Amino acid sequence: MGLPRPVLWLRRLWVLLQVAVQVAVGKVFLKLFPARVKQHIVAMNGKNPHFSYDNWAPTLYSMQYFWFVLKVQWQRLEDRTEPGGLAPNCPVVRLSGQRCNIWDFMQGNRPLVLNFGSCTUPSFLFKFDQFKRLIEDFCSTADFLIIYIEEAHASDGWAFKNNVNIRTHQTLQDRLQAARLLLDRAPPCPVVVDTMRNQSSQFYAALPERLFVLQEGRILYKGKPGPWNYHPEEVRAVLEKLHS
């Protein structure tokens, strides 16, 4: 069950204040200590060396940054997942347009790996080949599902330079069209999209990207949210332990 609405709105207000203070302090530090801030950002950026400092650092603490971070933090207030708990059986849509649910992809006691993300999230694409190798190595003992959610860095939102150019999805067809771009990368597992109500993204607190392992309807592994804590290698460790 989610939070009662009055409690949810009070927490949203508190988060709003926290994010506003974070952005204000960030702007001050960026103004007073630009070299130190750049050093910190470059160190973080080492986790995705194919996406340079100049592509995204100038957008830090912008109004678009503020709204995106606020959206992510508000979404996490409605997280309905916990290790060992029941996995939300949210509706999703196949690329054919057929509607189904997440649990439809579970088979007996085989683990089901959920990979939430979008093409405009650099870390999701940067680690896509790593995720594909995971599928190839464990396809005989586990199932995999990519759930395409709202864009992390839409071109009309908190956009980065030299990134994939996709606007905010206004319709389900927009989302399906964006998800089909992943097919060029030949994913060896089904790809579905979140509904326009963003229920799976909301209940799994998946924005901007996140990994889960389900088994028999329950959450076996809950990865931390990306971009910095999105680690397919942790899923590998979980699957290896299951079948050791």
Swiss-Prot record:
EC annotation?
1.21.99.3, 1.21.99.4
- Would you tell me the Gene Ontology cellular component terms? basolateral plasma membrane; endoplasmic reticulum membrane
Give the principal location in a single coarse category.
membrane
Q: Which GO terms describe its biological process?
A: amino acid metabolic process; hormone biosynthetic process; thyroid hormone catabolic process; thyroid hormone metabolic process
Q: What is the name of this protein? A: Type I iodothyronine deiodinase
Recorded source organism is Canis lupus familiaris
Q: Which residues form the active site?
A: 121
- Location of the protein in the cell: Cell membrane; Endoplasmic reticulum membrane; Basolateral cell membrane
- What gene codes for this chain? DIO1
